[in-house]
Regions:
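Polytopic transmembrane helical bundles with strong interfacial aromatic enrichment
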Residues: 1-259
Length: 259
């Protein structure tokens, strides 16, 4: 499986997700919603698995490879959110968010090889990346809910956001813990306040602040939605935005400095 074949798998997966989203929006033929969405996920994962086999390493090293996982998990998170709360529009927006990162990958192809630097040859590598990407996708759904709630002014969306943030921050915390164990093994320190690590803490603190504000239940709905949106933006900064900062050019977390 080569990167050149990604466009074929991506188009098929996006078409399936689009069919599922339209069926959900119309509120009819639930079997079509699940069949189309799951088919898209299967096609997308088939490409990831094919890359894994052909590269003889987990496709998690480059930024483009992590975007693959995010798009895949975004589809899963959107489907789970739809199953739980039955919002007809959630699959459309989750598919749209996944599509954004798929398009970035199509517009910015990478060179993929079998090399894997020593720091990435760790038992913590795969669980850290997958848990983090899944947490990002769940929090991506919370971002979608926050945007929708901000414009529709519905209280129920805030309760949905609560549940998504609780799950998302739980996985985010586990991902940070796995990352610290990995850092200890690879570089000798659990935490070094590297630029990426600093932004990880800022992101985590933003969602933790939301959780605490909800516990007191004295903060306005609009403020909470804005906080979720800002927290998601810091998450994007932590994921890839920090790579463009001058201070991050010597970061130990830049595994592929050409991407």
């Amino acid at each position: 499986m080569s990167w050149d074949q990604f466009v074929i798998f991506a188009i098929v997966a996006l078409l399936c997700w689009g069919i599922g989203a339209v069926a959900a929006w119309r509120g009819k033929r639930q079997w079509m919603v699940y069949t189309a969405t799951l088919a898209g996920l299967a096609v997308f994962f088939a490409f990831i698995l094919g890359m894994w086999i052909s590269l003889e390493r987990p496709p998690m090293r480059t930024m483009g490879e992590t975007r693959l996982w995010y798009s895949f998990f975004m589809g899963i998170a959107g489907l789970l959110t739809y199953i739980r709360w039955q919002y007809r529009w959630i699959l459309s927006f989750s598919a749209l968010l996944a599509t954004v990162f798929v398009i970035i990958n199509l517009m910015k192809p990478e060179i993929h090889d079998q090399s894997l630097m020593p720091a990435l040859q760790s038992i913590w590598f795969i669980p850290h990346v997958t848990v983090y990407m899944f947490s990002y996708s769940v929090l991506g759904c919370a971002f979608i809910i926050a945007l929708t709630g901000l414009f529709r002014h519905k209280e129920e969306y805030l309760h949905t956001a609560d549940n998504l943030v609780y799950a998302g921050i739980a996985f985010l915390s586990i991902g940070m813990l796995l990352g610290s164990l990995w850092a200890k093994e690879a570089w000798g320190n659990y935490w070094s306040w590297d630029p990426k690590e600093t932004w990880a803490v800022i992101t985590w603190a933003g969602y933790l602040l939301y959780v605490h504000l909800r516990l007191f239940r004295k903060t306005g709905r609009k403020t909470l939605y804005v906080l979720l949106i800002m927290s998601f933006l810091t998450l994007q900064m932590c994921w890839y935005g920090v790579n463009y900062l001058p201070a991050a050019q010597q970061s130990v977390h830049l595994y592929n400095r050409n991407n």
